[in-house]
């Protein structure tokens, strides 16, 4: 049996769902690979690049800024699962759109992380300068629980939250509002499987086995809603079964890929946007970074 380390670099469905299904359904074992799932959220690039990673957004930023030659071999979705969640204030109505975040306090990821970069792209497209128009509160996201506490106590007006929760259900529960889904405003082939060929060849049999297992997990997502919702409840334990199913039907089933291949046109536009936001040249093409066509089923 082959072995490989596979690191996730964020929390929630966006990062973990496909690998979780592949593990729990026994697909890794079926494909003859032992996968050690690692928490790489706090790892530096040198440690991360010695195994496979799920975080394609972070891998792309690393390739553009540090020259680490990551390649993506499998893509789960082109719609990042992050949302702008806002509360009403005591003296004025809460923001109703992204443009209304002007002058507000927004909890966000650091600018040179993948979610932080994506957020800044979306804010600029809404006509906002993230450095001048908004009071940004940069924090490590964790499971976003502290963001909910700060929204409750009024120390922030809005937060960029991820998929450790169903934000539309949280908003309904507390009388808050989901201003926007990042995936509606910025598309990028993101989360999947990536490797640095310096350490792991893209055709390494262990990696190919992981890709096959993840492809099978995607088939579950599209063909077995009840099974997928059951797995999603592992991550969304604070929500009812109906809320989890609604979240699946709205954000997961329509947008996760069928077979793990990247849309290179979407990828090209995303690389240009990310490089522009980072202030670096776009030194890699979509075809060079997204090698998913080369990992067709064996």
Language-model-derived ranges and their functions:
Residues 2-131, 135-138, 147, 157-163, ...:
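Short, glycine-/small- and polar/acidic-enriched structural segments
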Residues 10, 183, 262-263:
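Short Gly/Pro-enriched turn/cap motifs at secondary-structure boundaries
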Residues 59, 146-234:
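Pocket-lining segment of extracytoplasmic ligand-binding domains
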Residues 203-280:
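Secondary-structure end/capping motifs
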Residues 271-298:
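Conserved C-terminal helix/tail region of periplasmic/extracytoplasmic solute-binding proteins
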